[in-house]
Amino acid sequence: MFEHEQKIMIDRIVKELEENNFAIFAGAGLSAPAGYVNWKELLRPLSIELNLDIDKETDLVSLAQYYVNENHGRNRLTERLIDEVGVAREPTPNHKILAKLPISTYWTTNYDDLIEKALDNEGKIADKKFTKNHLSQTKKGRSAVVYKMHGDASLPDQAIITKDQYESYPLHFAPFVTALSGDLVSKTFLFLGFSFNDPNLDYILSRIRIHFEQNQRQHYCIFRKVNRADYSNDEDFSYNLLKQQFVIKDLARFSIKVVLIDAWNDLTRILEEITKRFRCKNVFLSGSAHEFGSWGQTATELFLSKLGEVLIQEGFKITSGLGLGIGNAFISGAIKEIYNRKYTKIDDYLTMKVFPQFVADPTERKNIWTAWRKDLLSQTGIALFFMGNKIIKDPESGKQTIVLADGMDEEFHIAHELGLKLIPIGASGYKAKELFNQIISDFDHYYPNSSPKFREAFEKLNEEVDEPVKLLSKIHDVIKLI
């Protein structure tokens, strides 16, 4: 379960994702679980050389500057960056979750490449920006822009880390300041693993607050609650608890709403819930039909067309592999509704991917179709299963036989592995009825902790109807309760 403020944040982020208005700002805390050090640990060996206690220091930017002043250069500082941040590491579970979402804008003060690597692992193209010249260049086919406002581990000698660099940042990196200011005005940000004592960010947030006063865009930040177990005495715990409260109130000046969590694994739970909720706005239809049972082809196609219309009306995006005898009518209804509503971009509401037919080798074809199915299902949250039969021909006798569609069975298992909500329409018969019975026989496995009301609505999908169009309200009731 999620707390009230967590639920509100999740609702808002899902809405912003649907409208392509969501962005991430990643701080050092997001990369820490991968093994990268925070600023304090990065500078600890250097503070020892300065005979200072890093645990007593709060102004780490000044500490880095002290070291440069004393050593007449930043060579040792650059070496520390190479040693600690230049080491390749794997993205964390949180990076992986974020990379699966349709987030087109990332900002970070981190030098590591975990965001870019996570995007690459998802087959997405990251357009990385960490110099002024990068801002005027656009990577072909990019999926997301990653703004690294403090530099990149590949150029450690240019990384922003000293007080001199921070003070001159608005002058030397003015295009980054302008770009971030624009995104903070037009997008809703989620700040993760971030410390708000960064002078650059403080400067930018202050400028936006002054310009927009009470009309600033709402942003979110996730903080872990100050925990007594982290402190050796009550005095330190009380002090840091009070300080966190002050920071939360101060961030409200910049329209940044802080949402507290008990432990860092709660962050993963929240991101998973956001992903699940977002994906549940995308419905996949699995099905094929060579014969249409007692309903007949005309009534079945009318129902499928109406189903496509209704899902678009309800604000869903639909995905289809254009199954034989099923997909065309379903897609036609959706397209008609999209045009009736004068939506300008069909791709925002509809994804069609026809299965490649002309692959001669059966083994290769099967592997390609499996990969195709995984790709189709990966961005959806609900899978409907309808009918599911096909015709096979005996190569010797030439006799044709109607059999259950094994492809639907594979789509069912892939969808289950990906965590989709599975809705076989048992009343349509064939493979869909078989899959319906499979779920009902082990309902708590497929729908753990579901309400009696949901199960009752689900079971109605198996009730026989004389006209398939009568299934529309039953399907709607099940989806509404998910």
Curated annotation (Swiss-Prot):
<feature type="binding site">
    <location>
        <position position="411"/>
    </location>
    <ligand>
        <name>3'cADPR</name>
    </ligand>
</feature>
<feature type="binding site">
    <location>
        <position position="150"/>
    </location>
    <ligand>
        <name>NAD(+)</name>
    </ligand>
</feature>
<comment type="function">
    <text>NAD(+) hydrolyzing component (NADase) of the Thoeris antiviral defense system, composed of ThsA and ThsB (maybe J591_1492). As purified, has NADase activity that is not activated by any tested cADPR isomers; binds 3'cADPR better than 2'cADPR. It was suggested the purified protein is already in a fully active state. Upon activation binds and hydrolyzes NAD(+), leading to cell death and inhibition of phage replication.</text>
</comment>
<feature type="domain" description="Deacetylase sirtuin-type">
    <location>
        <begin position="3"/>
        <end position="281"/>
    </location>
</feature>
<feature type="binding site">
    <location>
        <position position="355"/>
    </location>
    <ligand>
        <name>3'cADPR</name>
    </ligand>
</feature>
<feature type="active site" description="Proton acceptor">
    <location>
        <position position="150"/>
    </location>
</feature>
<keyword id="KW-0520">NAD</keyword>
<dbReference type="GO" id="GO:0051607">
    <property type="term" value="P:defense response to virus"/>
</dbReference>
<comment type="similarity">
    <text>Belongs to the soluble Thoeris ThsA family.</text>
</comment>
<feature type="binding site">
    <location>
        <position position="112"/>
    </location>
    <ligand>
        <name>NAD(+)</name>
    </ligand>
</feature>
<feature type="binding site">
    <location>
        <position position="287"/>
    </location>
    <ligand>
        <name>3'cADPR</name>
    </ligand>
</feature>
<dbReference type="InterPro" id="IPR026590">
    <property type="entry name" value="Ssirtuin_cat_dom"/>
</dbReference>
<dbReference type="Pfam" id="PF18185">
    <property type="entry name" value="STALD"/>
</dbReference>
<protein>
    <recommendedName>
        <fullName>NAD(+) hydrolase ThsA</fullName>
        <ecNumber>3.2.2.5</ecNumber>
    </recommendedName>
</protein>
<feature type="region of interest" description="SLOG (STALD) domain">
    <location>
        <begin position="282"/>
        <end position="482"/>
    </location>
</feature>
<dbReference type="GO" id="GO:0016787">
    <property type="term" value="F:hydrolase activity"/>
</dbReference>
<dbReference type="InterPro" id="IPR029035">
    <property type="entry name" value="DHS-like_NAD/FAD-binding_dom"/>
</dbReference>
<feature type="binding site">
    <location>
        <position position="407"/>
    </location>
    <ligand>
        <name>3'cADPR</name>
    </ligand>
</feature>
<feature type="binding site">
    <location>
        <position position="324"/>
    </location>
    <ligand>
        <name>3'cADPR</name>
    </ligand>
</feature>
<feature type="binding site">
    <location>
        <position position="390"/>
    </location>
    <ligand>
        <name>3'cADPR</name>
    </ligand>
</feature>
<dbReference type="InterPro" id="IPR041486">
    <property type="entry name" value="ThsA_STALD"/>
</dbReference>
<keyword id="KW-0051">Antiviral defense</keyword>
<comment type="subunit">
    <text>Homotetramer in solution.</text>
</comment>
<dbReference type="Pfam" id="PF13289">
    <property type="entry name" value="SIR2_2"/>
</dbReference>
<dbReference type="GO" id="GO:0000166">
    <property type="term" value="F:nucleotide binding"/>
</dbReference>
<feature type="binding site">
    <location>
        <position position="373"/>
    </location>
    <ligand>
        <name>3'cADPR</name>
    </ligand>
</feature>
<keyword id="KW-0378">Hydrolase</keyword>
<feature type="binding site">
    <location>
        <position position="288"/>
    </location>
    <ligand>
        <name>3'cADPR</name>
    </ligand>
</feature>
<keyword id="KW-0547">Nucleotide-binding</keyword>
